[in-house]
């Protein structure tokens, strides 16, 4: 008798792009369908950009100011996209290193993570995004890169898939890729 895996929240890593919007909408739909909180994460050092080592020589107070500014932008942008759905939380993470990401994304709860799959050779947290998804401890769904219906599931997300309440017309089996 295998325990049905559950999750406590849906996590989404902010990305201002077409695929980022698709991923947010998917995360929002999953939150609504499962009556779960949607956590929107923003990293001061973008985990999608594996060349980025910005903010290294900023002072602590400058980083704090930047974080506050980013969080404001984040709230404005995604509150509007979330519409009536109010169970949305925002969290700014300071570093895009693997450990910080892990700490930030696994904060106190087991989350289903939804990420924008921006392009075939996209990176996330310093490794190819499919490799990241495959190795990550939580269930991960990638959205994109070509259309919003194109979802890729890691092995942990596959176990959740039947109970997620995803709109069947929108996600045909053919679009679902197992990493």
Predicted features and spans:
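Structural beta-alpha unit
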Residues: 2-5, 80-113, 118-121, 165-179
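Small/aliphatic-rich secondary-structure junction motif
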Residues: 3-57, 135, 144-146, 158-179
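A conditional alpha-helix N-cap/helix-loop micro-motif detector
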Residues: 20, 71, 94-95, 122
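A short acidic, amphipathic alpha-helical/loop segment
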Residues: 22-26, 100-104, 127-131
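General small-molecule cofactor/ligand-binding pocket signal
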Residues: 39-41, 89-93, 141-143
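A short acidic, glycine-rich active-site loop
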Residues: 58-72
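Short, surface-exposed amphipathic charged segments that create phosphate/polyanion-binding patches used
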Residues: 105-106, 154-160
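Glycine-rich, Arg-bearing micro-motifs that act as flexible, cationic patches
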Residues: 112-136, 146-151
